[in-house]
C-alpha cells in the first residue's frame, strides 16, 4: 500500500511540475536563444535515433545516374540552398536565423555509408518537427527525393562553378 501511495505521489508531483513549467512561461522558446546543453543533448539524441530507426529499412537505389544529379541540383537550388548553403558559402540569413542551425551540406562529413543516404531520404521526405525542415514527401514523389539525395551526396565535392552548372534551369 505504501508503494502505491509513493507512486501516486510521484505521478501527481510529475504532472504538477510539468503543468507549472508549461503554464508559467519560464521556458524560453525564442529561436535566438539556444537550449541548455542538457536539453540540446536530449533533443539531438532523440532526433538522431528516431531518424536512424525510421530509415533503417529504406532501400537505396543507384545514385550515380547523371540525370538524378541534374534534377536533384535544380531542386536543391530552389528548395534547400537558402538553409543548407552552396559551395563557397559560409552562412545565409536563413542558416543564421534558424535554431537549431540547419547542417551545412557543402561540408564533407566523412561518413559515406548507406545509412546516411537512407537518413537523408527520410528527412527530406518526412521533415523534422519544430526545426524548419519541411516534409517534401507531401509534394514530391520518391524518385524526385532520391534525386536530391544523389545531389547532396556529391555536393561537398562541387566547386562553385560546378554547382552553377548543375543547378541551372534550362
Model region roles, listed by residue range:
Residues 66-89, 120:
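Sequence/structural segment immediately N-terminal to covalent heme-attachment motifs in c-type
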Residues 88-91, 101:
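Charged heptad-repeat coiled-coil "stalk" segments of single-pass membrane proteins
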Residues 92-97, 163:
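Short cysteine/histidine-rich zinc-coordinating motifs and their immediately flanking basic loops
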Residues 97-153:
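Extracytoplasmic electron-transfer domains, predominantly the class I c-type cytochrome c fold
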Residues 156:
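Low-complexity, rRNA-contacting terminal tracts
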Residues 159-170:
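Extracytoplasmic/periplasmic copper-protein system
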Amino acid at each position: 500500500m505504501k508503494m502505491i501511495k509513493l507512486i501516486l505521489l510521484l505521478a501527481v508531483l510529475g504532472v504538477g511540475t510539468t503543468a507549472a513549467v508549461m503554464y508559467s512561461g519560464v521556458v524560453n522558446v525564442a529561436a535566438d536563444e539556444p537550449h541548455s546543453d542538457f536539453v540540446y543533448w536530449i533533443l539531438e539524441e532523440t532526433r538522431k535515433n528516431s531518424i536512424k530507426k525510421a530509415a533503417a529499412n529504406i532501400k537505396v537505389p543507384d545514385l550515380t545516374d547523371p540525370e538524378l544529379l541534374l534534377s536533384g541540383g535544380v531542386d536543391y537550388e530552389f528548395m534547400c540552398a537558402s538553409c543548407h548553403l552552396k559551395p563557397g558559402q559560409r552562412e545565409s540569413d536563413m542558416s543564421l536565423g534558424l535554431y537549431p542551425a540547419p547542417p551545412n551540406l557543402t561540408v564533407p562529413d566523412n561518413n559515406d555509408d548507406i545509412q546516411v543516404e537512407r537518413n537523408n531520404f527520410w528527412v527530406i521526405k518526412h521533415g523534422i518537427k519544430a526545426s524548419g525542415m519541411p516534409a517534401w514527401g507531401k509534394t514530391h514523389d520518391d524518385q524526385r527525393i532520391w534525386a536530391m539525395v544523389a545531389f547532396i551526396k556529391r555536393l561537398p565535392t562541387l566547386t562553385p562553378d560546378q554547382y552553377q552548372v548543375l543547378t541551372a534551369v534550362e
